[in-house]
Amino acid sequence: MHIGVVLLLWLLPLRPDVQQAALTELSDKAGIVSLQDLTDDLRGRLEIKERVHVTLVDHNPLVMSVETLNGRGGPFVISVDRDFIQELTHAEVEAAIAHELGHVWIYTHHPFLQTERLANDIAMRVVNRSAFEPVYEKVWQRTGIRGNLIEFIGPPSQ
């Protein structure tokens, strides 16, 4: 695993520069969906009981990450780089949010197993694997660091 590509392995206290949640709307065939509603839907499908807030930030060097709001005991917050999310399709946003929720699931169920691959395995319970490929390509393009797709999401199904 390449450290520079890691979206976030450890849940750290929330940075002071994080802005409070904005309900970004995403176009979907079914209409307009808020980023928070999408997160809540995926959280429910993954049976995550803990509250998870979503917020857009002007700059996130990890492009997307999950942290605890008030240290290790507080609610979770997913911080999304405002410019990066504009590059993603609805399916890609869903895959990326599901990945971050995978970190929450791991943290709340297995605190010592916080890995990218496991988070993606959890996320792929509710989103299609093919949505992850362009997400990682865009992360790597934006960060300038390249990773091995199979390390992060496994080999394609046959």
Language model segments and positions:
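Auxiliary, metal-adjacent structural segments of Zn-dependent hydrolase domains
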Residues: 25-71
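Short helix/loop segments within enzyme catalytic domains
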Residues: 26, 34, 112-155
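Sec-exported extracytoplasmic/periplasmic mature domains
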Residues: 43-47, 106, 123-129
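Sec-dependent N-terminal signal peptides
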Residues: 3-11
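Acidic/histidine-rich, surface-exposed loop or edge segments in extracytoplasmic proteins
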Residues: 18-26
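Active-site recognition of the HExxH zinc-binding catalytic motif
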Residues: 95-108, 120
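Active-site scaffold of zinc-dependent metalloenzymes
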Residues: 59-89, 101-104
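Soluble non-cytosolic domains of exported or imported proteins
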Residues: 29-33, 87-92, 110-114
